Structure formats: structure tokens, C-alpha cells
């Protein structure tokens, strides 16, 4: 038998024969000096790391893109912050609004300002004043300075006085070109004679008393003399407002219509600023609305800031409607009686109604005017009601010779009565026309509003101009003429009045866009 050593040699030889290129060395193989060195094998590189490197590169690219987007966002925020800090409003062009009389308009970017905080400081000196300081974060005015202003400016005042800090022109953020009251407080300056302006940003407002409007009501808490303003709204209307207005904003806009005529709203705003030269709504009345909302609904300063924006928006809407020749009337007021009107239409440019002692006394009734018809067999009467609609009434008078008189009277109920007066001064016939809407409001181009029976419109035709000769007038032949009523005591005085007014019976007005304007 073969020994163990011999068997190992045989196995080694057999393995070398099987793999001549890669000889396998067994563990028990002993290398001697005579043996040849083993062949070195070539090392193969493994490329399995390529997908991992590509994934890392893609992630790095994604991070870089996000960093670039973050940098762009930071730059945008820096630009906006600089824009707000430096108050640099970049104007933008907006397309023309349909029906706009001025064509394309220009506006500014809306910038919301910080809502000012209201601090009420009571002053127990003899003037019993209130210091209502509107603190702006950009202002460093101290409360003591405002109290000193009161002490130096209004010594010995009997009524309460409000001192208001008004944001200056540079502090206002204009919402658009029509209003400059985006950031200003509503009670910024006073339109009453008892108010005084101190500096550019402080105005004194003297609170009124019950004697100013004995038939009116209080805005605000009537038991708190520091948070109430007397207004001309009668108690029944105030009850109606309190019942129907469920939100603070609706009540504010409703009170605005009761306290300010739409004509006043169209030419005014809260700040009295803007490129259109608008006037300022009476700050005392606006302060009364503010007190009323705080008392009824417990609103906050933030709510009042939003309501002020709605008031300014309502004024801008009235201004646009006026520019387009549209009606400015309040539809809910169309059935109100003259006594329930809180404003005086005969004085539309006043922010608030005058006290009861200054109201004009009603003219005696009836009022009459003798008007000479020129071959007219039909009289057309135009009236504009409080809803702004032109109401037309027709009167047919048969066989009225040229040169004879027609007497127009108005009774205490507002009804018009047309009388045909013969040459002997006797009333031949009478026709009664119910008053279409009372009071009738006639608007002139100057902005003056005439109320009730102060002005009526009758229609006739000049035979030479219309080409008619005693035949019934056609609608196109009627020329609208306006004649002011004059009180007469008898028919003789009426005839003299007609002779005096005869040269003035020329067409002076025209009907345009549903409103009557003086040429």
C-alpha cells in the first residue's frame, strides 16, 4: 500500500494537471527553495459603485435648486419689506371700467397698515375733556402732550371735547386715487364751527348736546356723556334701524345714509384727501357712529377699521354713480315722509343737519303760480322723487286760449291743483294731481338740491318754435320749463306775478340720463 506521503503527492500532481493556468496549492504543500514561485493573478476592478455616485449627484443638484429658490424668495421678501418701509407705491395701470366717464384710471397697490390702538384718557379739569389718542406705531407722541394741548387750547369749555391724533399725509396708505382715508381714523378733523385744529395731526371736536336736536336721538350710550353724540334721526327711525340692522357693518352703512345725503357721500370721504378734491365727512357724526357701534355690538378697533373701509367704499360708489349720471337715491327712502328725513335736501353740501334753531321755517300753504300757456292743451309735470326716478304727470286742459292763465297750487298734503283762470279772474275749472313722491327733490348742476314745492316743472310749447297752431301737442313738441312757485294772496297778485315771471319762462334745463341739470 501507498504511504500517506505518497498519496498527497499524487493528489497534488493531479490537481496541477487539471488547472495548469491556476495551480492550486494545498495546505500541506511545503514550498522549498527548488520550487518555482507562484504566478501572480491580475486584479479585476468592480464597477458596482457607479449608481450610488449618480444618486448622490442628483440629490446635490436638488438641494442646490432648493437653495436657489430660497434665495429668490428671500430677495422678494426684502424688496417687499423695503417697499413697505419706504412707502414706495408703484402705480399700475388698470383697464377702463365700463361706463367710466374718465376712461382708463390709475390706482395704487393696496397696502394694509397697522390698525391704530385707541387709548381713552379722562381729563377731570373744568373743561371735562376726553383725550382719544389714536396711537400709531410710527408715532412717538406722548399722552401728556395731548393733555397739554387740551389745557392750552380749550380752556373753560362747557361741553366735552375730543382730541384726535390724525395720521399725517405721509402715514396714509391710499387704497386708490379716489380715497385717501385707508389708514386715517374717521374722526380726524371737525367740520363744525366749534372745532379747532391744533397742528397738522391733532383736531379738537366738541361734543354736542340735546338742545341741538331736541327731536333727535343719541348715537352711542346716552347715559355716558363721553360716548354719545346727538343726531337728527327721530326715535321711530332709530328704532327701525336697531330692529333691521343685525350686524355692525350694516348698521354703520344705514346710519351713513340717514346722516349724510348721497350727494354729500359722492363728494366726500373719511379723510378729506384724494386727487378728486373730496371733502371730509363730519368727524363728529362719524365719531357718533363709532360710539353707537361700540355700544350696540361691542366691536373692536380692528372691526372699526374694516367698517371705515366699507364707508369709504360706499362713498366711492356714490362718486362713480354721480360721474356716470346714475341715480344716487336710497331706494328704502322712497316712501319716507318729509318729516322722517334726517338730512335737509335743500342744503346738500352740509355734512350734518343744522340744529333745530337754524332750520328754515316752512313756507305758507298753499303756494300758487299763474302760468301763461301758449296754445298748450297738455301740461306735463316732472318730479324727481327721493329714489331719483323721474315721475311724469300729464294734465289735459281743453280750450285754453293763448295768453290766459293757469294757476298751479299745492295743498298741505303735497297735491298739485291746476286751475284754469279766465280773463275776469274767475276759476273756470280745476284738476287735482296727487303728489307723486313727497318731498320732490330737484337737483341742479351746481349741486344745490331744491325740496318740495320750491320748484316744479311744467311743459308748454312756443307756437313759433314748435310749429303748432292750437293743435294738441305731441310728445316731441313739449319743452320742459321750470318755474319757481310764488305765494299769491289773490288772483290780481297772481297775474302780476305771472307778468313778472313771463320773461324768465325760457327753457333753462334739460332732462338727461334720468336726472335734471341746469344748462
From Swiss-Prot:
Cross-link entry Glycyl lysine isopeptide (Lys-Gly) (interchain with G-Cter in SUMO2), positions: 133
InterPro entries: BANP (IPR042343), BEN_domain (IPR018379)
UniProtKB keywords: Acetylation, Cell cycle, Chromatin regulator, Coiled coil, Cytoplasm, Developmental protein, DNA-binding, Isopeptide bond, Nucleus, Phosphoprotein, Repressor, RNA-binding, Transcription, Transcription regulation, Tumor suppressor, Ubl conjugation
One family name in Pfam for this protein: BEN
Sequence ranges of Pro residues compositional bias: 351-364
Assembly information from the UniProt record: Part of a corepressor complex containing BANP, HDAC1, SIN3A, SIN3B, RBL1 and RBL2. Forms a trimeric complex in the nucleus consisting of BANP, HDAC6 and KHDRBS1/SAM68; HDAC6 keeps KHDRBS1 in a deacetylated state which inhibits the inclusion of CD44 alternate exons. The complex is disrupted by MAPK1/MAPK3-mediated phosphorylation of BANP which results in BANP export to the cytoplasm. This facilitates acetylation of KHDRBS1 and CD44 variant exon inclusion. Interacts with TP53. Interacts with CUX1/CDP. Interacts with HDAC1.
Job of this protein: Controls V(D)J recombination during T-cell development by repressing T-cell receptor (TCR) beta enhancer function. Binds to scaffold/matrix attachment region beta (S/MARbeta), an ATC-rich DNA sequence located upstream of the TCR beta enhancer. Represses cyclin D1 transcription by recruiting HDAC1 to its promoter, thereby diminishing H3K9ac, H3S10ph and H4K8ac levels. Promotes TP53 activation, which causes cell cycle arrest. Plays a role in the regulation of alternative splicing.
Protein name: Protein BANP
Name of the gene this protein is made from: BANP
Amino acid at each position: 500500500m501507498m504511504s500517506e506521503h505518497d498519496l498527497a503527492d499524487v493528489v497534488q500532481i493531479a490537481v496541477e494537471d487539471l488547472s495548469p493556468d491556476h495551480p492550486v496549492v494545498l495546505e500541506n504543500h511545503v514550498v522549498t527553495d527548488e520550487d518555482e514561485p507562484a504566478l501572480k493573478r491580475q486584479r479585476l476592478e468592480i464597477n458596482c459603485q457607479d449608481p450610488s455616485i449618480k444618486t448622490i449627484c442628483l440629490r446635490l443638484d436638488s438641494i442646490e435648486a432648493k437653495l436657489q429658490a430660497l434665495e429668490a424668495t428671500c430677495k422678494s421678501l426684502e424688496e417687499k419689506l423695503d417697499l413697505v418701509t419706504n412707502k414706495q407705491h408703484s402705480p399700475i395701470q388698470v383697464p377702463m371700467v365700463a361706463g367710466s366717464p374718465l376712461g382708463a384710471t390709475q390706482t395704487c397697490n393696496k397696502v394694509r397698515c397697522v390698525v391704530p390702538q385707541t387709548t381713552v384718557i379722562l381729563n377731570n379739569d373744568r373743561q371735562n375733556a376726553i383725550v382719544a389718542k389714536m396711537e400709531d406705531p410710527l408715532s412717538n407722541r406722548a399722552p401728556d402732550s395731548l393733555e397739554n394741548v387740551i389745557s392750552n387750547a380749550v380752556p373753560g369749555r362747557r361741553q366735552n371735547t375730543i382730541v384726535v391724533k390724525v395720521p399725517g399725509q405721509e402715514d396714509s396708505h391710499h387704497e386708490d386715487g379716489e380715497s385717501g382715508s385707508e389708514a386715517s381714523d374717521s374722526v380726524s378733523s371737525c367740520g363744525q364751527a366749534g372745532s379747532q385744529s391744533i397742528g397738522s395731526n391733532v383736531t379738537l371736536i366738541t361734543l354736542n348736546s340735546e338742545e341741538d336736536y331736541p327731536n333727535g336721538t343719541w348715537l352711542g350710550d346716552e347715559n355716558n356723556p363721553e360716548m354719545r353724540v346727538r343726531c337728527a334721526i327721530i326715535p321711530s327711525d332709530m328704532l327701525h334701524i336697531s330692529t333691521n340692522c343685525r350686524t355692525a357693518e350694516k348698521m354703520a352703512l344705514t346710519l351713513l345714509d340717514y346722516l349724510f345725503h348721497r350727494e354729500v357721500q359722492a363728494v366726500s370721504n373719511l379723510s378729506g384727501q384724494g386727487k378728486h378734491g373730496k371733502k371730509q365727512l363730519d368727524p363728529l357724526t362719524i365719531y357718533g357712529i363709532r360710539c353707537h357701534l361700540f355700544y350696540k355690538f361691542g366691536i373692536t378697533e380692528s372691526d372699526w377699521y374694516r367698517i371705515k373701509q366699507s364707508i369709504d367704499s360706499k362713498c366711492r360708489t356714490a362718486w362713480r354713480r354721480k360721474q356716470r349720471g346714475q341715480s344716487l337715491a336710497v331706494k328704502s327712502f322712497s316712501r319716507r315722509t318729509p318729516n322722517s328725513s334726517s338730512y335737509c335736501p335743500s342744503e346738500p353740501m352740509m355734512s350734518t343737519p343744522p340744529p333745530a334753531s337754524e332750520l328754515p321755517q316752512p313756507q305758507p300753504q298753499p303756494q300758487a303760480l299763474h302760468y301763461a300757456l301758449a296754445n298748450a292743451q297738455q301740461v306735463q309735470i316732472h318730479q324727481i322723487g327721493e329714489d331719483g326716478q323721474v315721475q311724469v304727470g300729464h294734465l289735459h286742459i281743453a280750450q285754453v286760449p293763448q295768453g290766459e292763465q293757469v294757476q298751479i297750487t299745492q295743498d298741505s298734503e303735497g297735491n298739485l291743483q291746476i286751475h284754469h283762470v279766465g280773463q275776469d279772474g274767475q276759476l273756470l275749472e280745476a284738476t287735482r294731481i296727487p303728489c307723486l313722491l313727497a318731498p320732490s327733490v330737484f337737483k341742479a348742476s351746481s349741486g344745490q338740491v331744491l325740496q318740495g314745492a320750491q320748484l316744479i316743472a311744467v311743459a308748454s310749447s312756443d307756437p313759433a318754435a314748435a310749429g303748432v297752431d292750437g293743435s294738441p301737442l305731441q310728445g316731441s313738441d313739449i319743452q320742459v320749463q321750470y318755474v319757481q312757485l310764488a305765494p299769491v294772496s289773490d288772483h290780481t297778485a297772481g297775474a302780476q306775478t305771472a307778468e313778472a315771471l313771463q320773461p324768465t319762462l325760457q327753457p333753462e334745463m334739460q332732462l338727461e340720463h334720468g336726472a335734471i341739470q341746469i344748462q
